[in-house]
């Protein structure tokens, strides 16, 4: 993980750690001139590692985004941001996306009153995300909310801290995406691969 954040910069979904500023300067001096391919590859890897996807999963999302109406890059980011594991992370119910994925896999999370154990579940507007009524589930979420830094919540999400309940208001707007990334380079990377 630390090699990844040193190479690609801060990835808030992967870990809470930040790269040191001095090490970044050394990497730039050592690496020399960066080719266009390398720039596109690094943007793709940044997206992959932030959301914790395999190459095949990301390729599937790129194909879905390509078939949808609108800008492929924007649609791709919307698809990734509306995943259940990412929404739990953005609500503060998990400190990282892998932590959110574990909560979902261990069946601690309910969507609209039903247990969902698929981290890639695509949330829709007006979905209500809650925890199971079990004490252990509530304790896990409570610890995560207490330990996570209280950043500004994106406008497409609402959280009730007392009932441990989150609400998806709408599909995310591109300015609220939690990662600094040039999504066009990712789309370009995949368009050149085929």
Swiss-Prot record:
GO MF term (any one): rRNA binding
Subcellular location: Plastid, Chloroplast
GO biological process: ribosomal small subunit biogenesis; translation
Keywords for this protein: Chloroplast, Plastid, Ribonucleoprotein, Ribosomal protein, RNA-binding, rRNA-binding
InterPro entries: Ribosomal_uS4, Ribosomal_uS4_bac-type, Ribosomal_uS4_CS, Ribosomal_uS4_N, S4_RNA-bd, S4_RNA-bd_sf
Assigned GO CC terms: chloroplast; small ribosomal subunit
Domain annotation S4 RNA-binding: ranges: 82-143
Any Pfam family matching the protein: Ribosomal_S4
Keyword Protein biosynthesis: no
PROSITE patterns: RIBOSOMAL_S4 (PS00632), S4 (PS50889)
Disulfide bridge positions per record: none
Family per record: Belongs to the universal ribosomal protein uS4 family.
Job of this protein: One of the primary rRNA binding proteins, it binds directly to 16S rRNA where it nucleates assembly of the body of the 30S subunit. With S5 and S12 plays an important role in translational accuracy.
Subunit annotation: Part of the 30S ribosomal subunit. Contacts protein S5. The interaction surface between S4 and S5 is involved in control of translational fidelity.
Entry-linked NCBIfam families: PRK05327.1, rpsD_bact
The protein's name: Small ribosomal subunit protein uS4c
Originating organism: Sisyrinchium sp
Gene name per UniProt: rps4
